[in-house]
Amino acid sequence: MIELMRARYDFRIDGRELIVIDDVVTGARMENLASFFDLAPAQRIESDITGADTRLWIIPIERDIAEKQPYTTAIMSEVGEHFPNETFTLERAYCNAIAYGDMLYAHRDRRECESRDVTALLFVATEWKRDWDGETIFFNDDGEAMHAVSPRPGRLVLFRSAIEHRAGAPSRVCNRTRLTLALKLRANR
């Protein structure tokens, strides 16, 4: 049996890893995940920056429930492969639900620049067109945009949580919510 290689891209921003892996979740699993989050009740409680009046829609996931899900197993397998000499504990899990017109800000998931923590973002969709926009932009420590990662069904982005980044809102022509499953992983010391 021939195993197909998935597309993978490795970058470094100020010495911190940013890894993009395609097709981590596909087929029926992606369809089920997308259907679930499309219908799940969201809460407008999240903010990209401290003190912001804007709130973003998220679908919280209890940690003990997230740990038992096939998507978490697939993501953690990739984390283990790409960070082989490190171990992580799932600290938080939720799905971002971003729509046209949402205001998003550049932020770091961990403010400490030396943090070894990792954020995993899985784009949850059965289809995403290029003209729908929604790219995630990654910045260096000087605030310069260094990489843009396009949303793509089943695409996983692993990055050190200290990398500043900003999610992109979908364009006006997009009739869907941009869903990204986020796992915040604490590095075990």
How does the language model describe each region?
Residues 77-189:
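Catalytic core of non-heme Fe(II) oxygenases with the double-stranded beta-helix
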Residues 1-86:
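Non-heme Fe(II)/2-oxoglutarate
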